[in-house]
Regions:
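Bacterial N-terminal signal peptides
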Residues: 7-16
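C-type cytochrome heme c attachment motif
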Residues: 59-71, 84-90, 94-95, 106-110
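Short cysteine/histidine-rich zinc-coordinating motifs and their immediately flanking basic loops
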Residues: 77-82
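Positively charged n-region of N-terminal signal peptides that target proteins for export
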Residues: 1-5
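Sec/Tat signal peptide C-region and signal peptidase I cleavage site
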Residues: 16-22
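Detector for the c-type heme attachment site
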Residues: 68-74, 101, 113
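Flexible coil segments in periplasmic/lumen-exposed cytochrome c-class electron-transfer proteins
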Residues: 24-54, 62, 102-152
Length: 152
């Protein structure tokens, strides 16, 4: 776990040096259509049955992520595999003014990856069926690690 946090921290630090897409830079039509589709869905999740730690992480997610876009975007996205969320969060952290620290990024990741393993099970299973054996094992290990950490 410490190794994962250290690697995530290094990746975040390295990625922050990259130049983020300018806010006014146009988005291609396909990406714009995907975003619009995701934003049409619900903007909240019933987390009442989630573990307390995940509920706390949801609060960080909802506070930080709603500053720049609708929560319906990540909630209804087709991201489900932990690696998808890792890339997404790193990209959001690079955005100027995001205010997402490495610690917040980890909490947001934990929430989104955990939530996907519960609420997006069908999408997750479909993606894992198409993954390489190594990718599938890495995703399953990360999901197990999250459930071991939070399901008490």
């Amino acid at each position: 776990m410490r190794t994962y946090i250290a690697v995530l921290g290094l990746a975040i630090a390295a990625s922050s040096a990259l130049v983020a897409r300018a806010a006014d830079e146009p988005i291609d039509a396909e990406t714009k259509a995907r975003i619009e589709r995701f934003e049409k869905g619900p903007a909240t999740i019933d987390i009442s049955k989630y573990p307390d730690g995940i509920k706390e992480n949801y609060e960080v997610f909802s506070t930080k992520c709603s500053q720049c876009h609708k929560l319906s975007r990540p909630i209804n996205s087709d991201y489900a595999v932990p690696e998808d969320w890792s890339r997404y969060i790193k990209r959001m952290m690079r955005k100027p003014g995001s205010g997402i620290s490495a610690g917040d990024g980890k909490k947001i990741f934990d929430f989104l990856a955990y939530d996907s393993s519960v609420r997006k099970k069908k999408i997750l299973d479909e993606k894992l069926a198409k993954a390489t054996p190594e990718e599938k094992k890495a995703a399953e290990d990360k999901i197990k690690e999250l459930h071991d950490k939070y399901d008490k």
